[in-house]
Regions:
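Non-catalytic beta/alpha edge segments that cap or flank active sites
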Residues: 1-159
Length: 159
């Protein structure tokens, strides 16, 4: 059975049609179709309330197993994705953000400026990815190694 996945691009410019959503497309292209079913892919602005409502909708109503967000994890005044994600979480998973920053730092020291978090809300795993397509690709290569096992564990599978 495929892992029900949602892709959430968080970007003022993409949501206004002023920029193409290359990062969301990169995520979708990298998810093997035999393992993941992308059941939702939307673009929303960098707005705290919109982000929290959308994450709750994905988890509570649509019951997706994984939400991959892209954008809004930096230091800009409208970068509120981590705060909105934490607001809806039941449990934090710090190791994911730590490994993404650590491995990304090998390629660019700017990786330490990413504030992305990973959390669980009920049985949904939510992972914040950076906004740049290059950084998304690098992070996806890392998370694809453990994502199916993480989903299995959330649903009662073994360690």
């Amino acid at each position: 059975m495929a892992i029900r996945t949602a892709i959430l691009t968080i970007s003022d410019k993409c949501s206004q049609g002023k920029r193409e959503d290359k990062s969301g497309r990169t995520i979708e292209e990298m998810l093997p179709e035999d393992i993941y079913e992308v059941c939702q892919k939307i673009i929303i602005p960098d707005d705290y309330g919109t982000i929290t409502r959308t994450l709750r909708q994905f988890s509570d109503v649509l019951k997706v197993q994984v939400v991959l967000t892209t954008g809004g994890t930096g230091l800009g005044p409208r970068d509120v994705t981590p705060e909105a994600t934490i607001a809806v979480c039941d449990r934090r998973i710090p190791g994911i953000g730590e490994i993404l920053r650590s491995e990304s730092y090998r390629k660019t020291p700017n990786a330490v400026l990413s504030r992305g978090v990973s959390v669980m809300r009920d049985n949904t795993l939510i992972i914040n990815l950076p906004g740049s397509p290059k950084a998304v690709r690098e992070c996806m290569e890392i998370i694809l190694e453990f994502l199916p096992h993480a989903v299995d564990m959330i649903h009662g599978g073994g360690h």
